[in-house]
Amino acid sequence: PGLLAKYYECEINSTKNIDEEHPVETKIVSSFLTETSRRDSNYAFVFTGYISVPKDGYYTFYLESNDGSVMILNDDKIIDNDGAHGNAEESASISLKAGLHKIDVKYFQLGGGQILKVAWEGAEFEKQEIRPQFLFIDI
């Protein structure tokens, strides 16, 4: 279980600019955690892995961040919370089949408050942060 996390030290104002940077560190993490940042500002993370969907159905994903973030599910951007901004949450609902689905979350912190929360809810459970047992590095 877990995700591949790439950590960057950079001054950017959009997740689109992360791809132009070089990661300082790449490691396996249990979930979407940014506490391993070595700085209070001017950093970014890219989390890559798979999410295990327990049953066919509609799921709502939530992405709360300060500053910008995006969520990409099965190679489609489903949540765009990008840009330099204070704490904000965006969400998207999508129909998914049971099984593993590719998930990527890109996040950057320019300055000020720091937050990244990745949550979901389904017919069988209320909104909650995505727990490590649902996250996998590869299939």
Task: List each language-model region with its residue ranges.
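Extracellular/secretory pathway-exposed regions associated with glycan biology
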Residues: 1-60, 64-139
